[in-house]
């Protein structure tokens, strides 16, 4: 498993919009970014793992869609997420 429940809860606490938030775009983007960074490190050791590379590309696409949605709905929140995660967009 990539993320322990404690790590996931920590990420949710850092990006939640309200007290019971687990599904806002900010939280979803942060969780996807954590999984993407884990897989990126994985591929430094396992260069021929093409099956997982496809999964990585799907995660990147999901994150891109969520970022586009957030940018369209609320540019201020979008810029905040980009800055906090250090993404190049």
Swiss-Prot record:
One of its GO terms (molecular function) is structural constituent of ribosome. It holds the Pfam family Ribosomal_S15. Keywords: Ribonucleoprotein, Ribosomal protein, RNA-binding, rRNA-binding. GO terms for biological process: translation. InterPro entries: Ribosomal_uS15, Ribosomal_uS15_bac-type, uS15_NS1_RNA-bd_sf. GO terms for cellular component: cytosolic small ribosomal subunit. One of the primary rRNA binding proteins, it binds directly to 16S rRNA where it helps nucleate assembly of the platform of the 30S subunit by binding and bridging several RNA helices of the 16S rRNA. Forms an intersubunit bridge (bridge B4) with the 23S rRNA of the 50S subunit in the ribosome. Belongs to the universal ribosomal protein uS15 family. Part of the 30S ribosomal subunit. Forms a bridge to the 50S subunit in the 70S ribosome, contacting the 23S rRNA. This is Small ribosomal subunit protein uS15. The gene is rpsO.
